């Protein structure tokens, strides 16, 4: 059975580090602060907002919420972004996306209105460019691929000279994860829906980051002994036993039992990457405050 790369251990270490750093900032009179912009009241947004607020309180980050009605206009949203851009007490901003359907055509313009130094979840073009250029002090990488890197770092998984495969090419996970693995000196291949020999490519990898978003798409045919699997996806498996004794629970891309029986290490779903992302968001806010 593979070693489980548990997100809780990574999160606990991150939180302890952040508590020390926020205390040091507060001694200097700097209160690291996250601004949350939400248009409407989507249940998943509200759930994430609640979790983020709780995590912020734990590590010493303040939260300021900017709630707009579901029918807010482009001008309404831009006005709020201008407000947080001008507020020096706000160091990082999270805006829930996707925006409501009537703002879909304007989402690109709205996202890029945010000051890149406050873009803690990579929603501006400048932050995306920073990921491809190696970041430095230009914005922040998306929280999910950053969480993948935190897991690799925490468990001492050296990427240098390793073959890494990323399944998925989205701007949210796949592409930035590939760039970040390159930054760790891995040799990276991206597989996607048009790749014809994904299983063969994956078997030759040392590290697999799966962000396909397809239940049971990563099977025993894709893996071999010695590999590390980072399963990013959140899927619904109607046949998976749940905590209430019934069926229906979240799962990743990996057909977990058969893959875990072969590879050396794997992140579970739930309890893996997803549990680390909120602490990564707080880390980005703290880093933004330290840069300010």
Q: Where are each of the predicted segments found?
A:
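Short beta-strand segments enriched in small/hydrophobic residues
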Residues: 31-40
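Short beta-strand elements in bilobed, periplasmic/extracellular small-molecule ligand-binding domains
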Residues: 56-70, 188-190
